């Protein structure tokens, strides 16, 4: 538990821009180095994105926007003791920053000018009459609501935290308060504390970005429960992967007959996290820590799917059917033997990083839609899929990346017996590292198939049968300035470092 004596001096890490001095350049001028490739943002309703083949975009480090949000959050914390205690517990018990859990804040209308100057824009979304909603289209920032009488200067009148399950949050904090919205509502919320003119709320979303609680119909509730069960019971292992893909696509259509694609997307990824978590100890430990505060994986950043060349186009078609829009695409075939398509479903708030083996001569094609032929050799991603199955099918996600206080999480997990590999991104605006990988048993039939195709040596085959191979990770990530992008060279380095043929677990950073 946090020391109560430290609460008054807690200048929350939320005020990162000033407390740590990370950012000093104006958001309008600050762009990440050209080596960091980015893409166009999504919106709701999603705008037309520039095709990835048209060129790469640099995501900005929006330090002024972060500073502005942080100032408002700090002002709220100074007046709301429950929120202040929770911020300290998040830091000390989960290794996370209060900032990363904020869904939205409600401020005075006169604050609009400052937020607009920092890069926020008006969003057309369902909200109370007379309320302006602002979002940042180029950065990961909480949204801002400006209703009449919405705050006092820099002090928000309301701050809402994003939970994975609202009932879990209330139970974790022993709160006997009503929940607005039954299960199945796009937005559910509860009042957590009301102190000194500030109200702390907790919210739960189901494929929605709006700010009005609308009770679902009984039919929709039944449909949502049925859809969740269809995803949870999806069969993953078939005689051939083609059969598995066909089954997944059929299951998708069955779900879409029950609910809209935004709800279907939200429910699908909740089950994918559940499946991945069951196969990764670091994930279970951290989930338990976050569940103690009733938050679940509300801090997820992106979901990483490794895919075979044969079914990469199928995975991307599946995602687009769920409402994903393609963002940046990485072509690292000549550099490191891999490529990746990043996609975003803005309404559900889900980002997918899907990677695949890529040959040097394939860097000029749109490999997200063009079917890739069998390759004469396996890269890191292809071998992982050969040993364990595709993430879309048997293996589940390679990793979930969530947003943390990087150093605190590393140290706190170490105390739980979980080591962290050396960072593969170590910038002021982006730090990333894997927990040491979970070693999985490899089926003999998979090894035999790879041997028969000449893709493994006898020595490698023997090693995988005897020792297994690294399967999945939890990724520790810390972002600043709302930076949304990734570092291609850093990803190349970690892909090479986790190749099952020559993996040597890095020393803890």
Model-derived segments and their meaning:
Residues 7-509:
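Extended, well-ordered protein cores
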